[in-house]
Regions:
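A membrane-topology feature that recognizes alpha-helical transmembrane segments
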Residues: 1-369
Length: 369
């Protein structure tokens, strides 16, 4: 058999369907191994290509025979072969999840639209990467959001079937509308939420003292770690202080504004890292509060490029329900602090997955009632 026969798509069709199912699962696990690299390196602005895979603890360069998806982590019992340091179970989970996602795409669309199945594999790979990065860092890199929007739009030009049509014009229009409506709706929700709920005003007893330490804000009845206050660099604690006591100086009747990168007292500005302790007397303090950020806006634009405006709209509604259910469940499980620290991107990603595997039928059913 010559190379022409090997690469002839008509011969591929003769291969049993479930053989391709195995291929998609295996290929998904391999892709999942690369996604782990992206999840670890992208938030740190490191190259995902160089250097090759290595242990994050001892920097041991991992040879190819120790870089087999799923099997390596299991056989080494989640430890580095060289130094014995533990390797996060996340590596195994991402590889398995990606393999199952690719398999699901093939089983759902392989019979009727194999190219669409391949595109959805790419789409789900992006969702998985964004989800785990958002969980760990509360950011979604622009390479995923803007990159996803660009890739989804370009694919819509060459594969109209992605949007359920054979018309190039309709496909491009649905992708563009998905980008615009996806980003537009989430941005409107973001601005409205910021306007209505973006600040939490806490009244304090007269003469109450609050303490700013290196790691937390200490109120009279609670201690709030800074990581539960500052989700983004622009978040700020604002108050009008009666007195402010620093280690080497004091202030009276001064406006105080604290962000992760700057402490402002009146017109003076300081590096917060140089002020490890601060006693403040005030009657009211305003803390930042925000459910989603611009990363979620860009993320929805990328999603809309692949699944159109209906999918983007469905994803917004479904993610709200999923987020509410998850928050209530965590509170009932006495994990209230987890519910306040859950990023919104994973809910959007899960809603988009639901759309791909049956959400459109649910959408049509709801709007036909």
């Amino acid at each position: 058999m010559g190379f022409d026969a090997v690469f002839d798509p008509h011969n591929w069709a003769l291969v049993p369907f479930h053989f391709w199912s195995l291929v998609f699962f295996a290929f998904g696990c391999i892709v999942g191994s690369f996604l782990n690299v992206c999840i670890y390196r992208m938030p740190l602005d490191l190259s995902v290509v160089s250097p090759p895979s290595h242990c994050p603890h001892c920097k041991y360069s991992i040879p190819f025979y120790l870089n087999v998806p799923l099997l390596t982590w299991l056989t080494l019992r989640g430890k580095c072969k060289n130094c014995g340091a533990p390797i996060s179970p996340r590596y195994f989970v991402v590889e398995l999840l990606t393999g199952l996602a690719f398999l699901a795409c093939w089983l759902a669309f392989g019979h009727t639209a194999p190219w669409v199945a391949l595109v959805y594999c790419l789409f789900l790979a992006g969702l998985i990467t964004a989800t785990f990065i958002d969980f760990e860092h509360f950011i979604i890199p622009d390479e995923i959001t803007f990159g996803g929007a660009a890739v989804g739009f370009v694919i819509s030009i060459f594969l109209p079937q992605l949007h359920g049509t054979n018309s190039l014009r309709e496909s491009v229009g649905r992708s563009a509308l998905g980008i615009a409506i996806g980003a537009g709706i989430v941005y409107a929700v973001l601005r409205l939420g910021k306007l209505l709920f973006g600040r939490q005003k806490i009244k304090l007893p007269d003469g109450a003292k609050i303490i700013f330490t290196e790691t937390a804000l200490c109120l009279p009845d609670s201690v709030i770690p800074y990581e539960e206050i500052f989700y983004r660099k622009t978040d700020a604690i604002v108050l009008q202080a009666r007195t402010v006591e620093l280690i080497d100086r004091s202030y009276c009747n001064v406006a105080l504004r604290l962000t992760p990168e700057m402490l402002k007292l009146g017109d003076e500005k300081f590096n917060p890292e140089h002020e490890p302790h601060m006693d403040v007397v005030c009657s009211e303090i305003i803390l930042p509060r925000e459910a989603m950020g611009l990363g979620d806006v860009k993320f929805m634009a990328g999603i809309g490029a692949f699944i159109g405006w209906q999918g983007a709209f469905f994803s917004l509604l479904a993610s709200s329900l999923i987020g509410s259910a998850a928050g209530i469940a965590l509170i009932l499980l006495r994990k209230r602090e987890w519910s306040s620290r859950m990023p919104y991107g994973p809910y959007i990603a899960l809603a988009a997955v639901i759309w791909i595997f049956g959400g459109k039928k649910l959408f049509d059913l709801l709007f036909q009632m």
